[in-house]
Amino acid sequence: MSPRNRFLALAALALTGSLALTGCEGLDDLPDPARSDDAAPAPGGSALEAAEGLTVKGRAPKTGYERGEFGSAWIDTDRNGCGTRDDILADQLDDVSRDDDGCKVLSGVLDPDPYTGTRITFERGRSKVDIDHLVALSDAWQKGAQKWSDGKRRAFANDPLNLVAADSSTNRSKGEGDTATWLPPNKAYRCEYVAGQVSVKKKYELWVTRAEQDAMREVLAGCPEQKLPSGGNPTEAPTR
């Protein structure tokens, strides 16, 4: 055996003995950094800290924006057979009734409406309930979405993480507003609302303006324990 090979053999023997002395049974007991359950970050996290970490830039021009840039409205991105709007209504309303195909929500109750804190009855065709994008599509367009793939824009427009059933007139008063220009009248919901916007912007790597980040800080400073919501759909919608 060459001197080099003799050295390697002795080193391996020493390592084995060291593991035995420390109570380890072998290298298989050491954590594998490639395993997702070892490397995954802890769930939750502070919404305020996440807001601090968002990229800050100026708002880009709205040139080229139209609703169709984010795909047809309320497509079935999760492939459960139902459109996104009906999925959100079924998930966020109480006392839901559906048609015979099991998808279309015919009636229900939004209690409370997060934006106003009131009780709203939903009836299909005479609805006072909208499905709002927490981060408006046009706001996203001006803060990074112009450069996305079509699939990513479809995913964003239909991601449950970015969608909330809310009073229609209040939602329409929001328009394209971000945190700096609009907050829900229901002050009890503002921390959750802003945390939702932060989560969506973090997930989709959208930037914020300085005024927007300052407004996020101001709201979340009043609820520093507010957790960052997570989940929703993948950030690339399947091809249709």
Cite the ranges covered by each PLM segment.
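Bacterial N-terminal signal peptides that target proteins for export
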Residues: 1-11
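N-terminal low-complexity, Pro/Thr/Ser-rich intrinsically disordered segments
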Residues: 32-69
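Domain-level detector of nuclease and nuclease-like folds
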Residues: 114-240
